[in-house]
Amino acid sequence: MNSCKRFPRSARICLPSEYYVAFEQGRRYSSVLLRLHHLPTSGPVRLGLVVSRRVDIRAVNRNRIKRALREVMRQIAYKLVPGDYVVVVRQTAKDVSNAELSVALLSLLRRIGALPLASIDNAMLPFFERNCSRK
């Protein structure tokens, strides 16, 4: 992947203390595949992912799930309400496709009001491409 299309460090939740705050103070929403903790903030949209070994013992499969969810968030981050979003993947997500994970995350985001009900296009985000030089 081109480095200019990656999640910048400012768009990720990195520290355990930041996860703790989102878990303790944020609102929790659940679906069959995912649990979402949302903490509204005045800063940018930030994403944290939790995929435990209970979901799948193989790291390859856990990383596939994280890549799929990260890609969805990368594409829609500019449409979201500012805040911290921590996605906890449930065991039922082990054998589902990337498309099903995407639909589950989008429906959760719509349900909490963080994403407009309009259709999502696959346009690249200006937020993540602003420092990208095209040749």
UniProtKB/Swiss-Prot annotation:
Keyword terms, alphabetized: Endonuclease, Hydrolase, Nuclease, RNA-binding, tRNA processing
- Report the GO terms under cellular component: ribonuclease P complex
Pfam families with a match to the protein in the record: Ribonuclease_P
List the GO biological process terms: tRNA 5'-leader removal
Catalyzed reaction equations: Endonucleolytic cleavage of RNA, removing 5'-extranucleotides from tRNA precursor
- Family in the record: Belongs to the RnpA family.
What is its biological role? RNaseP catalyzes the removal of the 5'-leader sequence from pre-tRNA to produce the mature 5'-terminus. It can also cleave other RNA substrates such as 4.5S RNA. The protein component plays an auxiliary but essential role in vivo by binding to the 5'-leader sequence and broadening the substrate specificity of the ribozyme.
Q: How does it assemble?
A: Consists of a catalytic RNA component (M1 or rnpB) and a protein subunit.
Protein name as catalogued: Ribonuclease P protein component
Tell me the classification of the organism that encodes this protein: Bacteria, Pseudomonadati, Pseudomonadota, Gammaproteobacteria, Lysobacterales
